[in-house]
């Protein structure tokens, strides 16, 4: 038994090391790649200081943190809702953050500071997550909870579309395009949003014990002495915060929170002590690679990263849905 446990521990460490190396390589590639390839030796030249340190580095850090946040949010929601298909984008949480953001632009007439817009996005994500948690407490089946989340997402999307058509604000129309997901406008002015993600990410990665209990189911978690009400509300707040900040940074990006936790579980990372940091590393790597594809796929324009993640993630989601039905 001890031998098996040690083998599993070594395997987990190997996986985390491999994911760390992958993330580091993706980060370096993201800083080098672009319309102009800038090698490591040119990073401290005048050209490198402009392209690498002023343009690419803030974008790369934002992509890294948002990818980690979305993947961890997916893992937390799957444990929280006891549902393998739970994910911020599919369950409408990202669209809820978008509604909060657009409401702030409309009501504030474009005069609100960036921090207020970020807080409104977080509030929108929290409201949708709380509604979903109420549905989950009624012990809906996987398909019903998924449909409820999709319905909430459609309602939020419709509200955003109505706001766009009845608004004369150019900022709001640009915001709708940005809500499709993209890091094109990220620079050092958004560094406060990046910093807002770091403490919550680190805190959740340290909460493996309650997460493991929640993954066992509500009855087992109660029997093990876990205060369910407290942990549900804290994790809902943390997830809403991460999704809201991510939407404020880059718009709605789907499928990262669904696909990454599933792939890692298929690789044997089921213990949340390893799954949570693994999700952070894998989510950051996957979104960095998707961002590189979005930047380089077209010569004269930049693809929206939400299009890239949806193209890659939708087939995996269909496969997972068919697998869940079996």
From Swiss-Prot:
GO function terms (MF aspect): vitamin transmembrane transporter activity
Annotated membrane topology: Multi-pass membrane protein
Principal subcellular localisation of the protein: membrane
Annotated GO CC locations: plasma membrane
This protein's record includes keyword Transcription regulation: no
GO biological process entries: cobalamin transport
CDD domains: TM_ABC_iron-siderophores_like (cd06550)
Signal peptide: none
Subcellular location: Cell inner membrane
Key words, A-Z: Cell inner membrane, Cell membrane, Membrane, Transmembrane, Transmembrane helix, Transport
Residue ranges crossing the lipid bilayer per the database entry: 15-35, 61-81, 88-108, 112-132, 146-166, 184-204, 240-260, 274-294, 302-322
Role description: Part of the ABC transporter complex BtuCDF involved in vitamin B12 import. Involved in the translocation of the substrate across the membrane.
Subunit structure: The complex is composed of two ATP-binding proteins (BtuD), two transmembrane proteins (BtuC) and a solute-binding protein (BtuF).
Record-stated family: Belongs to the binding-protein-dependent transport system permease family. FecCD subfamily.
Name of the molecule in the record: Vitamin B12 import system permease protein BtuC
Gene name, Swiss-Prot/TrEMBL: btuC
